[in-house]
From Swiss-Prot:
Substrate binds at residue 313. Keywords: Lyase, Pyridoxal phosphate. Pathway: Secondary metabolite biosynthesis. SUPFAM superfamilies: PLP-dependent transferases (SSF53383). Induction: Expression is highly induced during artificial growth in symbiosis with Populus, which is close to its natural condition. It comes from Amanita muscaria (strain Koide BX008). GO terms for molecular function: cystathionine gamma-synthase activity; lyase activity; pyridoxal phosphate binding. The gene is iboG2. The keyword Lyase applies. Cystathionine gamma-synthase-like enzyme; part of the gene cluster that mediates the biosynthesis of the psychoactive metabolites ibotenic acid and muscimol. The first committed step is glutamate hydroxylation by the 2-oxoglutarate-dependent dioxygenase iboH, and the last step is decarboxylation of ibotenic acid to muscimol by the decarboxylase iboD. The order of the intermediate reactions is somewhat ambiguous. IboA likely activates the carboxylic acid at position 5 to introduce an amide bond, and the flavin monooxygenase iboF generates the N-O bond. This is Cystathionine gamma-synthase-like enzyme iboG2. Belongs to the trans-sulfuration enzymes family. The modification N6-(pyridoxal phosphate)lysine is found at residue 417. It comes from the Eukaryota.
Length: 628
């Protein structure tokens, strides 16, 4: 398949020019170089020459150039009065986008296309409803594509669905579609697009598309690829389930039952079921997994507000706010806020004891970017007492370092991050806890309604990338701990005088008791959970706040590593997190400790000493900027 294996030990990279893909020279890279503080600000301010320089971006935040190309072609063909469009892999997802827009009083229509290679199905117009199932629709080189068209001034509304739900067309699927159109355009006869019609959509006659796009495909959607993808997806599900079992503790599982017994632990561990591959569901992005978890809760449980506990990645909160009846937001994720939550639960239950006071509680372990770990023991107790779902996003902690499934009804992970590591493919997973009291209902619904929209070629790359996941975690854990142990004594929080660093946000220092309670015991189930005893580590992510904006900018600019959005890469990647995620709400974020000057660093597998040297140099630049 033309894939190359990534080394677990890599060289520390210098920053690369603005707008180039990160990692460079990588098809379907999912980050972009933002090498300086000022260029990042200019990008967020919409300065034209800066935005024009961007050749890439994080796929949910930045519509990739090949996706823009295909969208433009389809807008020219099917758009009326300058309509814009969004592209989706299935009718079901397109309809969800349409409903999201209609709920905001925006009209949207769907055109379905069957894109066929020359000579397939004679390129005739095919009028039909959604295929019976996705496997039938992708059983050949032909590709179904669903186009949501809407008024041009409503693009920002459609883009919210694209960003929050993460269900837009994959860049690899886009390349496949463009390659078919390119090949077909070279032939004198035949149409490369066949519209499918749906209720409420007018028929659109096919026209020849002229396409001048030269695509270098990594693979083709066809027989062998689909067979490989089916195997890859099965291996991914088995790998995730296997990691949860491998790094789980039999003794530990006996202490929790997710609603089947009390927390004192009086039930034998043999009454507990291990998670299997059939409890693991794959999605095209981590946010798609989160979005679907929320939709699953809305479908299975009585309607109520959700709870967002702890300051989360920005789109998680948006999903809980924009779908369903809204959410209660507890940004600190502290024990005192659990007390506040309990008061709300008591009040709501007193008001109506016939249904749970909340739908579900979503939390990250630990949180991004403040690395705060909530007290899962208390949250699980409340979930049992008041009968609501507990969904835990363990992306930052990861399968190797923390064991949080025993507390969760639903476990969520962005596989795009450290599970992949190569930053060249997106993916997400949702795992149902087989020991949960609501497992049967959740399982029945997802089994009936789950649609596999994970593009085959993406699954193949994800499987390949994740083969050395465990080995990479150990290297990254050690590197990050060495860096944070170096930086912490230079912080105000640690009592340093004339410091430029205010705080080092890292699980070892932020709510360590909650994090360490969930450390994996290691594969030998050593009862002492600590990195030194072969157990889980503190992960590869940390954030820094500074005593001045000038110090923040100087530190960031001086870092000799890749700089741009995303995390969990095999290489060290820094970003101005708050500017990227909350630029239009800086004051709002600051009140919860997410300061505008925060720098987030995802540590890679480079040489430890080389990493320490660049961190020390950046610290020196920050001190100089403050006149120290």
């Amino acid at each position: 398949m033309g894939l190359s294996r990534t080394m677990t030990a890599i060289q520390l990279n210098s920053s690369i020019p603005l707008g180039l893909p990160v990692p460079p020279h990588t098809p379907h890279a999912i980050s972009v170089s933002l090498p300086t503080w000022s260029e990042t600000v200019a990008y967020k301010e919409g300065i034209k020459h800066i935005n024009d320089a961007l050749l890439n971006g994080y796929p949910r935040m930045f519509i990739q150039l090949n996706v823009r190309k295909l969208s433009s072609l389809l807008e020219q063909k099917f758009g009326i009065n300058g309509e814009r469009c969004m592209l989706f892999p299935t009718y079901k997802v397109a309809e969800q986008c349409q409903l999201f827009m209609q709920a905001r009083s925006v009209g949207a229509r769907i055109v379905g296309l069957l894109i066929c290679p020359e000579g397939k199905q004679n390129n005739r117009v095919i009028e039909c409803k959604e295929p019976a199932n996705l496997s039938e629709s992708t059983s050949s080189a032909s590709t179904n594509l669903y186009v949501v068209l809407f008024p041009p001034d409503m693009f920002s509304i459609a883009n919210q669905f694209w960003q929050h739900s993460g269900q837009g067309i994959s860049s690899r699927l886009t390349d496949h579609c463009l390659s078919i159109l390119t090949e077909n355009a070279a032939h004198a006869n035949g149409s490369s697009l066949s519209p499918l019609t749906f209720p409420g959509n007018s028929h659109v006659a096919p026209e020849q598309l002229e396409v001048g796009h030269d695509v270098d495909l990594e693979g083709r959607c066809g027989g062998p690829l689909l067979a490989d993808a089916a195997i890859a997806k099965q291996v991914l599900r088995q790998r995730i389930a296997g990691l949860l079992i491998r790094y789980g503790s039999c003794d530990y599982r006996a202490e929790l039952c997710v609603g089947k017994k009390n927390l004192e632990g009086n039930q034998n561990s043999r009454d507990f079921a291990d998670v299997t591959e059939n409890d693991v569901y794959l999605f095209p992005t981590g946010m798609t997994a989160i979005w679907n978890a929320h939709q699953l809760a809305l479908a299975v449980r009585p309607t109520a507000k959700s709870v967002c506990f702890g300051f989360p990645y920005s789109d998680t909160l948006k999903v809980l706010q924009k779908w369903g009846p809204g959410c209660h937001f507890f940004a600190g994720g502290t024990d005192s806020e659990i007390d506040e939550l309990e008061i709300i639960l008591e009040q709501e239950f007193a008001r109506d004891s016939t249904k749970p006071p909340v739908l579900a509680l979503f939390t990250e372990f630990p949180s991004n970017p403040l690395l705060c770990s909530p007290n899962l023991l208390r949250l699980r107790a409340l979930a049992d007492k008041y009968d609501f779902l507990l969904a835990i996003d363990e992306t930052i902690g990861n399968f190797v370092n923390v064991e949080v499934l025993p507390y969760a009804d639903i476990l969520l992970t962005s596989l795009s991050k450290i599970f992949s590591g190569n930053a060249n493919v997106m993916g997400g997973s949702l795992v149902l806890n087989p020991n949960g009291r609501h497992y049967t209902a959740l399982k029945a619904h997802i089994a009936a309604h789950y649609q596999d929209i994970y593009y085959p070629e993406d699954a193949i790359h994800m499987e390949w990338n994740s083969r050395d996941f465990e080995q990479r975690i150990k290297i990254i854990d050690d590197n990050a701990e060495a860096i944070c142990d170096f930086l912490r004594p230079h912080s105000v929080a640690a009592g340093a005088t004339n410091a430029v660093i205010k705080e080092v946000f890292y699980p070892k220092y932020i709510t360590p008791e909650n994090y360490e309670r969930c450390l994996t015991k290691g594969t030998n189930h050593d009862l002492s959970s600590s990195p030194s005893n072969g157990g889980g580590g503190y992960g590869g992510l940390f954030s820094l706040t500074f005593t001045s904006g000038a110090a923040s900018a100087a530190f960031y600019d001086a870092l000799s590593c890749f700089k741009g959005p995303s995390l969990g890469t095999n290489f060290t990647l820094a970003c101005t997190y708050t500017l990227l995620a909350h630029f239009k709400e800086l004051e709002w974020a600051a009140q919860y400790g997410v300061e505008a000057g925060l720098v987030r660093i995802s540590v890679g597998t480079e040489n430890t000493e080389a990493l320490l040297r660049t961190i020390e140099a950046a610290l020196g630049a920050a001190k100089e900027a403050k006149g120290l």
